[in-house]
Amino acid sequence: MDAIRIERLSKTFPNGRKGLEDIDLAIAPGEMVALIGASGSGKSTLLRQIASFSSSDARPSRIDIFGRSIQRDGRIARDVRRMRRDIGFVFQQFNLVDRLSVETNVLIGALARVPMWRRLAGRFSRADRALAAQALGEVGIAEHARERAANLSGGQQQRAALARALVQRARIILADEPIASLDPAASRRVMEMLRALNANHRLTVLVSLHQIDVALRFCPRVVALRAGRIVYDGPSAALTRERLHALYGDDAHLPFAVGDEVRPAAREAAGEPARRAPAAFDSAGSPDLPDSQPASPRRMLAASSMR
C-alpha cells in the first residue's frame, strides 16, 4: 500500500491558469522525496492538494492516503479532518502562534485526537505534555519549551513545527519550502532533522526545495515539476547538469545551481558511505517565493492542528 497515491490530478485556478496537469505519483511508506521546480511550477499547489486544503478539477482523479481516498473526482472526502491526522504540514512561513509558548504550539498537534471539550478548554494531559517534551528533545530545542514562540529563530521555529508533527503522530510530513527563509546553517539542521525523522520514525517525507544541491544531498528520489507537470521522477543520482538542462532548458541554471557531483543521499541508498555536503549547500541561494500567497495566521493554525 502506498503512503500517497495520485492519479490524473489536475488543478485550474479561478483565473484559468493551470496549476497542475495530469499528475500521477506514488510514494511508498518511509520514502524521502524531494519536489523541485522553479517558482510557479506547482510545488506548493501539489502539496496543498495532497492535504486537500482545496479541491482539484471536477474530472476523474484521485488522491489516496494509505489506501483511503482523501479526494476523488474533485470532491474532498467528508472525513478529511480525520484523514489529515496522518499528515503533518510544515509551511514555508513559520506558522507558530507568537504569543504562545513553544510547548503549547507543539501541543497543538495533539488537538486532532483529543475530545472536543478538551479542544475547547485547551487542556492537555500529562501524557500529551510528556510527548511534547520528548518531541522537543528529539528536534533539539527542549530548553526553549517555556519561551514564547516569537523568541525562536527561524530554524528553531521550523524544528518546533516538526516536533508538532511528532506530537500529532503524523505518518506523512509535507514540507513546503521549509528552508527557503533560513540561513545555510539553519537550513542544514532542518534538513538533517527531516532525514532523522524519516529514518528513525519511518515517516514518509515529501519536501519541496528550491536548491538542487539540498535535494541531491538529502533525498534519494526527486520529482521535478515544470508548468504543473511532472517532467522527471527518479533517483537523485541521475539528475545531472545535462539532465537538468534537458528538462528546464535555458532556465536550468537559475533555480538549480548544482555544486559538485557529490550525492550522499543516492550513495547512502546504494549502501555506500556518505561524503561531505556540496560546497554550494554551504552558500545556499536566495529564498524562493511560494507558488501561492501564504495563509493567514488563523488559517495556518487551523491547518496545522489538522482538526
Swiss-Prot record:
It is found in: Cell inner membrane. It catalyses: phosphonate(out) + ATP + H2O = phosphonate(in) + ADP + phosphate + H(+). The keyword Repeat does not apply. It comes from the Bacteria. Residues 265-307 are annotated as: Disordered. Gene3D superfamilies: P-loop containing nucleotide triphosphate hydrolases. The complex is composed of two ATP-binding proteins (PhnC), two transmembrane proteins (PhnE) and a solute-binding protein (PhnD). Part of the ABC transporter complex PhnCDE involved in phosphonates import. Responsible for energy coupling to the transport system. This is Phosphonates import ATP-binding protein PhnC. It comes from Burkholderia pseudomallei (strain K96243).
